[in-house]
Amino acid sequence: MLIYDSQYTPDEYAGVTGRSKVGWGHSTYVAGCELARSAGVGQYVLFHHDPTRTDANVMDLERRAQDLFAPSIAAREGLVIHLDETARAAWAA
């Protein structure tokens, strides 16, 4: 599982739709999808959403991420993730 700062879209990050966010310490959902795929993780969790986003905006980003890396979900208030024994053993190693 990868829980990754996915605050911006690529256009927001690059400054296409406003001020560039490069160097602000955040990332994009696309970079998260690429990292999840290259690392071979089983689940990607988009985390640290831009505070100006509505729930509908976050759901849209979740769908976009799923188009790039199917096992993607957006973190949301109240989300609980249960790890199986294999994941717990890997975490402890």
Labelled PLM ranges:
Residues 78-83:
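A short acidic, often aromatic-flanked loop/helix-cap motif at beta-alpha or helix-coil junctions
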Residues 1-77:
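Cap/insert and terminal regions of metallo-dependent hydrolase folds
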Residues 84-93:
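Short, surface-exposed amphipathic charged segments that create phosphate/polyanion-binding patches used
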